[in-house]
A protein has these predicted regions:
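Glycine-rich phosphate-binding loops of nucleotide-dependent enzymes
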Residues: 1-393
Length: 393
């Protein structure tokens, strides 16, 4: 695709790219930077790229983990069209609904081993889950409801650009407060503003009844708040470093004095996390990149639990992990609440928030649209709040 001077021609490249983009229904300028596109659009660019390679088989690895519902619908329509055109699709997912919605046949794997193959029209969700985890999980949401204690954090009228607009809420010890919303609702952005990771335009934060004097991550961590980010691979862990390195990264001051490392204390912190969270590993010196998604998530939890938080903010804690690992994470969350931690659970999976939280805040476009207690939970009502539809309609 060179011009008459032997140089790469951007115009010719754009012209060649257009039919591939049109084939996946992507209406964007071929000269646009990929980094400026939404995650869903980036996913479509990857698929369009496969056409330019004349691919006959397309492998999609957890393609919906960061997509909005609208983007998922577009992706599924594209996959169905590709199937009609004769392309073979390998669709890797942990989400049961996607298996039955999209796939003809299902291959189940566990710990690197082939566990079985089924026709999706001839099997049930419980059968697949049993094959995936090696046992019948029943209801794998683990939640013991206790009366919440004192208010641990109160947020008043937080404003942070368009990410958070006049947001107020409180969370108590022993309580799991759920934050639900569609992708882009502002849940994670609000928590980052509270934590001091993003600038806050106005508002007040009270911890144990006292107004915070500063607004930065070090101050908030020192006063008992820990934020477990939603992306363990890009924000949470240094995957090419060891479990020990990652687990102790947030508490270096506990075992490093005058540039001298107290290796015994470092080992104690690491082994405590491995034991309490049942991290499956032959050694704390194993790189996190070699672990399963579930065990990576446990390492990330161990990292922030090592700071001894009183308030734990969990961003999408079960994203991209299998149902067995999810059940283990739910047990951990439930036990932490029983121990008195105030937990804020951010999730885009409605069943997760409904089954694990005591109360729920629903967000849309930076606004808190509604608050529901557990006995008020109703899927239709929650979705109306999330979509900005009046519950009186």
């Amino acid at each position: 695709m060179k011009n008459s001077f032997g140089m790469v021609s951007k115009d010719k490249m754009a012209e060649a790219a257009r039919p591939f983009l049109e084939r996946v229904g992507l209406d964007v300028d071929p000269n646009e930077f990929v980094g400026r596109l939404s995650i869903g659009q980036q996913q479509m660019v990857e698929i369009a790229k496969s056409f330019s390679l004349n691919a006959k088989i397309l492998i999609l690895d957890e393609p919906t983990s960061s997509l909005s519902e609208k983007e998922v619908d577009v992706l599924f329509d594209t996959v169905r069209d590709l199937k009609k055109q004769g392309m073979g699709i390998i669709f890797i997912t942990h989400k049961m609904a996607e298996v039955f919605q999209l796939c003809d046949a299902v291959t189940i794997m566990r710990d690197g081993e082939f566990m079985g193959e089924r026709q999706s029209a001839e099997c049930s969700e419980s059968e697949l889950i049993s094959l995936m985890v090696g046992r019948d999980l029943g209801n794998y949401y683990v939640r013991t409801y206790n009366k919440p204690g004192d208010i641990m954090m109160e947020v008043k009228n937080i404003n942070a650009g368009k990410r958070a607009i006049d947001c107020s809420f409180q969370v108590r010890s022993g309580e799991i407060l759920g934050f639900y919303g569609l992708v882009g609702a502002g849940r994670s952005e609000l928590m980052k503003a509270i934590m001091g990771l993003d600038p806050m335009d106005s508002g007040e934060i009270y911890l144990n009844g006292e107004k915070t004097k500063k607004h930065d991550p070090a101050y908030m961590q020192k006063h008992g708040i820990a934020l477990v980010p939603e992306s363990r691979k890009t924000e949470g862990l240094l995957l090419n470093n060891t479990i020990k390195f990652n687990t102790t990264l947030a508490v270096l001051d506990r075992f490093i004095k005058n540039l001298v490392v107290n290796t015994r204390k470092e080992d104690e912190i690491t082994e405590d996390g491995i034991e309490k969270l049942h991290i499956k590993t032959p050694s704390s010196l194993v790189n996190c990149s070699t672990l399963s998604g579930g065990n990576q998530q446990k390492v990330l939890l161990a990292k922030w639990l090592a700071t001894d938080p009183k308030i734990l903010i969990l961003g999408e804690p079960t994203r991209g992990i299998d149902v067995g690992a999810k059940a283990e994470i739910y047990t951990i969350i439930n036990n932490l609440a029983k121990q008195g931690l105030a937990i804020i659970l951010i999730s885009s999976e409605m069943p997760e928030v409904m089954n694990m939280s005591d109360r729920m805040m629903i967000m849309r476009e930076g606004h808190i649209m509604g608050e529901l207690s557990h006995d008020e939970y109703d899927q239709e009502r929650i979705l109306k709040y999330a979509m900005g539809v009046s519950n009186n309609e």
